[in-house]
């Protein structure tokens, strides 16, 4: 039985196993406080995220279960890696991942990025997205603060709390406004993996320019700013709008022509502009795919088709339409955590056996 210890962080009780020491607050995640800690087992620095009261409502239980399942399933160099997970006696959940020193938002607010860093960061974002999308997952909330970076410039995408199934009927409204794809704002009816490519394009533009490309004050202003640069949406995109109010709003806007991006980004590499043009396209069906973008000439210094893996299997979304009581989600969550620790223990045992044989 694990021994739990308590610590007070910003007035919040962290109740964690004695394996983790030296807790220091590093920020707030989407649904909880994040601390750095030292893992006594591995001597590595880790991030510990507290998800408060995951069993308080069926909606929160389901969301927590979804993030847990995703973190278990997604295993890739450019995706944050789950190293431990447990539920405390107070029934809060703690998710332990590797700790990276900073995030892209902090980097962008501290100094302009040199060309080779912009290329390398964009390459890693797209490499991660190629894998995520091949698993049948859409991140939906890609933004600079969800992109973690270490001192070696290794990059990892995090915060899959809002991620959803690839579904042509996907609904709702999610990501931070500046990075939100127009089809989310326009239709509220259906969107797919292309929303992440739009977000990545906005992040790419911000790396080139040093400031957000579309800093809208609200949804209406956001869309207006987008059309100033990219022009009025084509008729076949407007035809997909389901909401009468949204349709009237779009039709009321003055007709605008798409502006050449090279006029906006005067100092940027022409190849960077060409790739950005392929990412920031109104029609999601014509937006470049992650795998195609990786093969773009701009990313040639890093592109290696033999080292840009796809997921071995699709993520199982069968639970996603379930409307279950808290107690059922709780049993399912405990089952997933037990499975994670069993798989982990078996992998360690296999590695130990191999070492013994090799020795």
UniProtKB/Swiss-Prot annotation:
PTM comment: Dually phosphorylated on Thr-171 and Tyr-173, which activates the enzyme.
GO CC annotation terms, alphabetical: cytoplasm; nucleus
Domain of life: Eukaryota
Modified residues (Phosphotyrosine): 173
Regulation (activators, inhibitors): Activated by tyrosine and threonine phosphorylation.
Gene3D superfamilies cross-referenced by the UniProt entry: Phosphorylase Kinase, domain 1, Transferase(Phosphotransferase) domain 1
Residues reported to bind ATP: 26-34, 49
Annotated SMART domains: S_TKc
Cofactor: Mg(2+)
Annotated active site: 141 (proton acceptor)
PROSITE patterns according to UniProt: MAPK, PROTEIN_KINASE_ATP, PROTEIN_KINASE_DOM, PROTEIN_KINASE_ST
InterPro entries: Kinase-like_dom_sf, MAP_kinase, MAP_kinase_CS, MAPK_p38-like, MAPK_Sty1/Hog1, Prot_kinase_dom, Protein_kinase_ATP_BS, Ser/Thr_kinase_AS
Keywords: Activator, ATP-binding, Cytoplasm, Kinase, Nucleotide-binding, Nucleus, Phosphoprotein, Serine/threonine-protein kinase, Transcription, Transcription regulation, Transferase
UniProt modified residues of type Phosphothreonine: 171
Protein name (Swiss-Prot/TrEMBL): Mitogen-activated protein kinase HOG1
Species in which this protein is naturally found: Hortaea werneckii
Gene: HOG1
């Amino acid at each position: 039985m694990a021994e739990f210890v308590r610590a007070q962080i910003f007035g919040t009780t962290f109740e964690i196993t004695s394996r983790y020491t030296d807790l220091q607050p590093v920020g707030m995640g989407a649904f909880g406080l994040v601390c750095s800690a030292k893992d006594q087992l591995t001597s590595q620095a880790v991030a510990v995220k507290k998800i408060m009261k995951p069993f308080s409502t069926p909606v929160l239980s389901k969301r927590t279960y979804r993030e847990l399942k995703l973190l278990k399933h997604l295993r890739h160099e450019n995706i944050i890696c789950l190293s431990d997970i447990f539920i405390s006696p107070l029934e809060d959940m703690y998710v332990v991942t590797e700790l990276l020193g900073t995030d892209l938002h902090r980097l962008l607010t501290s100094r302009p990025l040199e060309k080779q860093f912009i290329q390398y960061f964009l390459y890693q974002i797209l490499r991660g997205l190629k894998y995520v999308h091949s698993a049948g997952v859409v991140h939906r909330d890609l933004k600079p603060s969800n992109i973690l970076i270490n001192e070696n410039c290794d990059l990892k995408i995090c915060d899959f709390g809002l991620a959803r199934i690839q579904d042509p009927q996907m609904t709702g409204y999610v990501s931070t406004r500046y990075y939100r794809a127009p089809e989310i704002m326009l239709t509220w009816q259906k969107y797919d993996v292309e929303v992440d490519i739009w977000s990545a394009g906005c992040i790419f533009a911000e790396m080139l320019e040093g400031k957000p490309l579309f800093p809208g004050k609200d949804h209406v202003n956001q869309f207006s700013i987008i059309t100033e640069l990219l022009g009025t949406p084509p008729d076949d995109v407007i035809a997909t709008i389901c909401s009468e109010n949204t349709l009237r709003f779009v039709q009321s806007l003055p007709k605008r022509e798409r502006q050449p991006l090279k006029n906006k980004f005067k100092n940027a590499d022409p190849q960077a502009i060409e790739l950005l043009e392929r990412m920031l396209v109104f029609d999601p069906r014509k937006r470049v795919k992650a795998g195609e973008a990786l093969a773009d000439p701009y990313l040639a210094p890093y592109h290696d088709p033999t080292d840009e893996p796809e997921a071995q299997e699709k993520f199982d979304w069968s639970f996603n339409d379930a409307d279950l009581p808290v107690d059922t989600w709780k049993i399912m969550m405990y089952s997933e955590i037990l499975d994670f620790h069993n798989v982990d223990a078996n992998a360690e045992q296999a590695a130990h056996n191999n070492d013994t044989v090799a020795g």
